[in-house]
Regions:
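Helix-loop-helix
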Residues: 1-226
Length: 226
């Protein structure tokens, strides 16, 4: 099912793009990345809406913080009830990230299968896209891009996070903890894993984060005005 549902369609799409783009694997990866980002766009919109809504809830969260003081359990419960009432899911931003990881594993299989063909040209700029980047430049760019994308997401939720960060008992604040942990989790993971992955896969990850950052900026402007 995994093979027929995801691997084979991605392989055929990638080979099609490779052939129509002058058998340039780098350009094919760029085109494939753009297509996949557009496919995942509907899943990113709820995450952006949730982030903007969380910023709007900052005054209410601050009020709750003042009401409950050192009562961490009471505040956490009230916070969850407020989020539920406002239709805010603190995990809304996780699904697109999880799906990106799933797609990354699928593309690893696609690239391994494709690179096994002698007719595929893997040269792109200074890279052999079938091998890890010996200069470690691409993994660093991918990790930096992931960090930038995460930071771009932060202003939309910063209002809610600030409520927690201004108090001594901020460890009970869900938004604060989740935002703090997720900010560096994916960049570190990208850096570590990218060290061993074929450059073609790391190139996809880098381009995907660039498109994601641009997408977040646009969507935040659109839904932040509503």
């Amino acid at each position: 099912m995994w093979q027929s549902f995801l691997i084979e369609p991605l392989t055929q799409l990638f080979l099609f793009l490779y052939n129509i783009l002058g058998q340039n694997m780098g350009l094919a990866i760029g085109a494939l990345t753009l297509i996949l980002r557009l496919v995942l766009l509907p899943l990113s919109i709820p995450a952006i809406k949730a982030a903007v809504k969380q910023k709007d809830l900052a005054p209410k969260l601050a009020k709750l913080k003042g009401q409950y003081g050192s009562d961490k359990t009471g505040y956490a419960k009230a916070q969850m009830e407020l989020m539920k009432k406002e239709g805010l899911n603190p995990l809304a931003g996780c699904l697109p990230q999880i799906l990106q990881v799933v797609v990354l594993f699928a593309l690893y299989k696609v690239f391994i299968d494709t690179l096994g063909k002698d007719s595929i040209n893997t040269n792109f700029l200074y890279l052999d896209l079938g091998l890890p980047d010996q200069y470690f430049i691409l993994p660093l760019l991918a990790a930096a891009g992931q960090l930038v994308a995460s930071k771009i997401m932060m202003p939309a939720v910063q209002g809610g996070v600030a409520v927690a960060s201004k108090t001594d008992d901020n460890k009970d604040d869900l938004a604060y903890n989740m935002q703090k942990q997720s900010l560096y989790l994916f960049p570190i993971m990208t850096l570590v894993v990218g060290y061993k992955l074929p450059s073609g896969l790391v190139l996809y990850w880098f381009l995907s984060t660039v498109f994601s950052a641009a997408q977040q900026v646009i969507l935040q402007k659109v839904y932040g005005k509503k």
